[in-house]
Amino acid sequence: MLNTHLDHIGKEAKREGAALVARRSLELVPDGVPVFLTGDMNMLPDNESLGSLREALEDAREVAPKSDHRTTFNGWGNDHRILDYIFLRNAKAVEFSVLRDADYGAPYISDHYPVALTATF
């Protein structure tokens, strides 16, 4: 299980950060062992800088048969984008969810909604 929070401003920092995390996921985890990488990547799904992650791992949102494509960033009600991801390798994504329907007693508990994955391995 790996987690990261990539830079939110610099394009080069995003690209290099994603490449580093992808590379380290391959180096740290032996072949055949399930890997799950979660995090605020601070990039929209069509950002080319996610390419290195998608080469090393699968995007759970894209491969899960049951998938939630709602936004994960709410900007405290002022913005709505997909910035949070779960990537996996050597496991099968079953269901990807954005947890934004619960009532926590406040309109927003964070500027991001949690994401969840049901997987088998």
What are these regions (language model features)?
Residues 1-6:
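Active-site-proximal beta-strand elements of phosphoester/diester hydrolases
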Residues 9:
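A short, histidine- and acid-enriched strand-loop-helix "catalytic/donor-clamping" loop
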Residues 12, 16, 26-36, 41-121:
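Metal-dependent phosphoester-hydrolase catalytic domains
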Residues 19-20:
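Preference for well-ordered, secondary-structure-rich cores of eukaryotic proteins
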Residues 23:
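Short, well-ordered alpha-helices that flank and scaffold nucleotide-derived cofactor binding pockets
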